[in-house]
Amino acid sequence: MASPASIVKLPNRGMASDPEPAQVSYLPWLPYWAVMEADFLQVLRSWVYRSWVLVVALTAIGLFTYRWGLHHEAKIIQPASHVIIHLMRGMLVGSVALVGVIAAGAIAAERGSLADSILSRGISRHQYYLGKWHGRLLAIMLGHALLGAIAITGARFVLHEDVTVEGGAAAVAMSGAMLAVVVSLGVMMSALFARPLAAAAALWVLLYAAGVVFGALPHSVPTPEWVLQKLPYVLKGEFTREMLTQVAMYAGGACVASAVVGMFLFSRKDI
């Protein structure tokens, strides 16, 4: 048996060295983006969302067709701003119920698989909540902008033109701000309740209670009724930048406050 001293190591003839481990970059907001994208597409495919967009679009087309026939048969001049304000009132009142249902099912509808399938895969509760909130908010705002564009375009071409493009865009933005608050409150309720029906019921109770409180506030506060009263003038272009800023600040503050409360309670809730 050869001694250890007599063992000669042969030179390395072309043997490849061990490859260096690849640098893996971790994007901390990638789970949030995945949840937001999946939820956004899920809302677009839901029958409640499609029914909402279809019903409102058909209502607008039917109303414009009737008004157009009335104008050509009876020669009655109908300002577009009056027709649009009636349409937008109906859109907002009718949309609150369906939008509330869509928002209330953001988290409550996935309680059965929430802990095992989602929160155990490297995503925090805050990221999950933000992804759900922004996904629902983006889908609702997209649908509202589409319906608003249909209403403004139809009114300008079919009825007596007294609506400006800037006024129409501002009116859609102001009404969209109110829907954004409803969506934010709905997602907050969805994080607190285990069932979508309970979350939707709690949301409607909260909205009715808020309506009572809004009635006692000063007229300078941009409540939903205040916004609806200003819309006819906004459609004609009679608005100021301060008015839009005021609505955006109040609506944005309500959205952020509801999101903070929802994330705080959701992070401490046993699921």
Predicted regions and their residues:
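Alpha-helix N-cap/helix-start motif at helix boundaries, enriched for small hydrophobics
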Residues: 126-130, 266
